[in-house]
């Protein structure tokens, strides 16, 4: 599972959404 920093959600295309 990919986890982003500080409670952000990983996007299916890459990157994070906060």
From Swiss-Prot:
Keywords: Amidation, Disulfide bond, Secreted, Toxin. One of its GO terms (cellular component) is extracellular region. Disulfide bonds join 4-16, 8-18. Expressed by the venom gland. Its main location: secreted. Belongs to the poneritoxin-Ae1 family. This is U1-poneritoxin-Ae1c. It comes from Anochetus emarginatus (Ant).
């Amino acid at each position: 599972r990919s986890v982003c920093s500080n409670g952000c959600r990983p996007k299916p295309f890459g990157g994070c959404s906060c």
